[in-house]
Amino acid sequence: MKRLIPFVISMLAVPLIGGDLHGKVAAHGVRNSADAVVYVDRIAGKTFAAPSEHAKIDQKNMQFVPRVVPVVVGTTVDFLNSDALLHNVFSPDACADRFNLGTWPQGQTKTFTFKKECFASLLCKVHPEMDGFVAVLPTPYFAVTSADGSYHIKDVPDGTYTVKVWHPKLKATQKSVTVAGATEANFEIAK
């Protein structure tokens, strides 16, 4: 019995790991199913602190890389310029405080902290063909789809949630999903 008590106490100290939410998003009206953000909208009674580690978006070959980045509200994003020319990052969106980081050369990084839930567009005043997006979300349970539409969100607590899908060019969708262990949820989105 004396050996059992420490074991039981140690098991209580181990955090419970949730299930995995996975599936595919079929995106109609675009070249492929990449760049959709699949996320658990809210978990009743829980709020999530932003991670101390910054998210990173590079400006490389005159593109934002990655093009779509989901983060939790309060996350700071580092914007690196890897190109041998000047770049600028700004967002015209009010939810992102219409920030403008100015212009900077290769090898330098500027940062911005996203304080409100939103889908913020990223643009470059020097190169108007560049665009990117930051999805600022209420939970850390999110994924960006690959070109075939597949996604995988790890460690989602068991429960029933509204799972939403957002894409830069398509109409958002949502549905109720009950996560219990490994759970599959598929979506379709279109213009």
Task: Enumerate the language-model features and the residues they cover.
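Positively charged n-region of N-terminal signal peptides that target proteins for export
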Residues: 1-4
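Bacterial N-terminal signal peptides
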Residues: 6-15
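Extracytoplasmic copper-binding redox domains, predominantly the cupredoxin/blue-copper superfamily
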Residues: 18-191
